[in-house]
Amino acid sequence: MTSFSRQSFMSSGGGIGGSSMRGPSMGSMSRSSGIGGGGGGHISAMRAGSVYGGAGGHGVRISTGTRTFASGGGGGGGASYGFGGGSGGGGGFGYGSGAGGGFGGGDMDAKVNVSEKATMQNLNDRLATYLEKVHSLEKANGDLELKIRQFLENKTSPDARDYSAYHATISDLQDMIQDATRINGGVYLAIDNAKLATDDFKTKYENELAMRQSVEADIAGLKRLLDELTLARSDLEMQIEGLKEELIYLKKNHEEELASMRSQMTGTVNVEVDAAPQEDLSRVMAEIREQYEGVSAKNQRELDAWFQTKSETLTKEVTANTETLQVSKTEVTELRRTLQGLEIELQSELSKKRSLEGTLADTESRYSIQLTQLQARVTSLEEQIVHLRGDMDRQSQEYQMLLDIKTRLEMEIAEYRRLLDGGATSFSTSGGGGGGGGGVVSSTKTITVKTIEEDIVDGKVVSSTTK
C-alpha cells in the first residue's frame, strides 16, 4: 500500500522581525508577523495557505486565502497567520488573517471582519466534516473488526466449527464402505467355497477319469480275451467238423470194406478142415465199431461239454463285462454331465467374480474421487483462512495506521486551536504608532508556499519532490 503526504512550508519576508514554526509531519503551519513604522503604513498581500488531501494521501490540493489591507498615516502594523494541514484520512483546512493600523490616518476595509467570520465558519465546517468522516471511519472499522472477529471465530475456532453436514455425509460414506466391505467379504467367501468345491470336483474327476481309464483297459483286455476265445471256438468248431468228416469217411470206408468182404465171402468154397474154430469177424467188427463209436461219442460229449462250459463261462464273462461296461458308460456320462455343470458353474462364478471386481474398482475409484474432492475443498478452505488471516493482518495494519493518523490529526487540531486562541489574543492587543507630517511608509509581506510530495511504501519514504 502506497500513501502520499504533502507538506507545506510558508515563510515570511520583509518587515521587522519574523518567525517561522514547522508543525507535525502530516501537515505544516507557519506564523509570520511584522510591524512597520513611519509617517504612513501600507500592509498588503497577506496570504494564508492550506493543504488538505483525500483519503490515502491522493488528490492533494492547496488552497490559499489572500487578504489585502491598506492604511495611511504615520505608522502601521500588521500580523498574518497561515495554517495548512492534510492527512490520509481525507481532510484539510486553511486560515489566513491580517490586520493593520496607523496614526497617520487612513481607512480600513469594512469587509475584513465579515471575511474573517466566513473563513472561521468555513474552517469550522471543514473541521466538523472531517470529524464526521473520522467517526464514520471508526464506526466502519469497528464493524469490520467485529465481522472479521465473528468470521474467524466461526471458521478458525475448532469448537465453533459446524461439521454436522459433513458428519452425515461421512456417516453415509462409512455405512456404504462397511456394506461394500461386507459384500466383498461374502464374495471372497463364496469365491473360496467355489474354489474348494472346484478342487473337490477336480479331484473326483481325476479319480473317475483314472477309474474310467482302468475300466477301458479292462474292457480292452476282455475284448482281446473274447477275440481269443472266439478264435478258439472257431478252431474247435473246425476240429469238430473235421472229426465229423473223418467219422463219415471212416463209416464209409468201413461199409465199403464190409461190402468187399461180403462179396469175397460169397464166392468162396467152404472147406472144412479140422482146425481150431475161427472168431466171428462180424462180431469183431461190430465190437470195433462199437468201440470206435463209443470213443467218438465220448470225445464228442467231452467236446460238447467243454464247449458248453467254455461258452457259458465266456457268456457269463461277456455279460458281466457288458454290464460293467454299461455301468461305466453310464458313470462316465454322468461324470461328463456333472463336469459340464461344474464348468458352467465355474464360468458363472468367474464372471460373477470379474463383475464384483469391476464393481469394487468402480466403488474405490468413485470414493477416491470423492475423497480427492473433499481434500481439494479442505485445501481451498485452508487457503481462504490463510487469505482471511492476511486480510485481517492487513486491515489491522491499516487500522493502526489510521489510528496513528487520527492521533496526529488530533494533535494538529489541538495545536491549531491553541494557535487560533493565541492569534485572537494578538489581534486584540496589536497596534501601531508613529509620527510624521504626511509621509507614507509601506510594508509588504509575501508568503511563499512550498509543497513537498513524498511516496511512502510500507512505512518507508521512496521518493520526495519539492514544489
UniProtKB/Swiss-Prot annotation:
Further comment found in the protein's record: There are two types of cytoskeletal and microfibrillar keratin: I (acidic; 40-55 kDa) and II (neutral to basic; 56-70 kDa).
SMART domains: Filament (SM01391)
Annotated site residue numbers, Stutter: S365
Cross-referenced Pfam families: Filament (PF00038)
Residues covered by region (Coil 1B): 170-261
UniProt note on tissues of expression: Optic nerve.
Stretches for region Coil 2: 285-423
Assembly: Heterotetramer of two type I and two type II keratins.
Highest taxon of the lineage: Eukaryota
GO CC term (a single one): intermediate filament
Region (Coil 1A): 116-151
Spans annotated as Linker 1: 152-169
Keyword Ribosomal protein (UniProt): no
InterPro entries per record: IF_rod_dom (IPR039008), Keratin_I (IPR002957)
Protein name (database record): Keratin, type I cytoskeletal 50 kDa
Family: Belongs to the intermediate filament family.
Region (Disordered): 1-40
Bias type Low complexity, positions: 21-33
Residue span of region Head: 1-115
Residue ranges occupied by any IF rod domain in the UniProt entry: 116-427
GO MF annotation list: structural molecule activity
Segments for region (Linker 12): 262-284
